[in-house]
Regions:
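Short beta-strand and adjacent tight-turn residues that come in two discontinuous sequence segments
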Residues: 19-26, 100, 111-116
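Flexible hinge/capping segments at coil-to-helix
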Residues: 36-71, 151
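Short beta-strand-to-loop elements that line the ligand-binding cleft
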Residues: 1-6, 73, 91-103
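Central regulatory/effector-binding core of bacterial HTH transcription factors
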Residues: 1-29
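Beta-alpha-beta core module
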Residues: 31-39, 43-44, 96, 104-152
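C-terminal effector-binding regulatory domain of bacterial HTH transcription factors
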Residues: 82, 133-134, 138-178
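Secondary-structure junction motif
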Residues: 63-93, 168-170
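Short, hydrophobic alpha-helical packing/hinge segments within bilobed ligand-binding/sensory domains
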Residues: 9-13, 19, 98-109
Length: 178
């Protein structure tokens, strides 16, 4: 097991051959660094309500329902291709999106969105799963031309991640078919 402080370090380690692969959410930075992304599963966005009235739904909700509330992203919304597209679509539908947690301090109803990979085994009585565009693609990142052993390992991971998703993430995730 190799430890990296951030995605930049992971990219460097992949390019230098210090590591063979990494499990990540798809982002533009992967291709920009000359790395390859192999999708495995669709990973949904989890919404964590703050100071919301009891009628704010829990469980699975569509984007059209979620845009009625103030949003904030747990990280930078541009961290993944999916969150960038989600940000643009929510803005198009006139969602109120804030860039920080100040609304929580003022006790205004807000929903914090975070990729499910960062919120394992969500309790759907307390949070919601955003149903929009299947979710972000989660998969395996390698250098552009991995060796045959790594390629076979990637194929096995692509097959196993959907089967193990409920055990790993607390919810059944849909495989990415390509």
């Amino acid at each position: 097991m190799y430890s990296c402080a951030n995605r930049k370090d992971i990219g460097r380690a992949l390019l230098n051959g210090e590591i063979d692969l990494s499990l990540q959410i798809e982002c533009a930075e992967i291709a920009a660094r000359g790395l390859h992304f192999y999708p495995a599963v669709y990973m949904p966005e989890i919404g964590i309500p703050f100071h919301t009235p009891p009628e704010v739904p829990r469980g699975h909700i569509p984007l059209e329902q979620a845009v009625k509330y103030r949003w904030m992203f747990a990280g930078t919304p541009e961290q993944s291709l999916y969150e960038t597209a989600l940000l643009h679509e929510a803005s198009r539908q006139r969602a109120e999106i804030i860039r920080g947690v100040k609304s929580v301090q003022y006790k205004l109803p807000s929903l914090m969105l975070t990729p499910a990979v960062y919120y394992r085994r969500p309790n759907l009585e307390q949070v919601f799963v955003l149903d929009w565009n299947k979710g972000m693609r989660f998969g395996i990142v390698t250098k552009a031309e991995p060796d045959p052993v790594v390629e076979e390992y990637v194929r096995q991971l692509q097959h196993l991640l959907p089967l193990l998703s409920e055990k790993l993430f607390g919810m059944k995730l849909e495989p990415v078919e390509e």
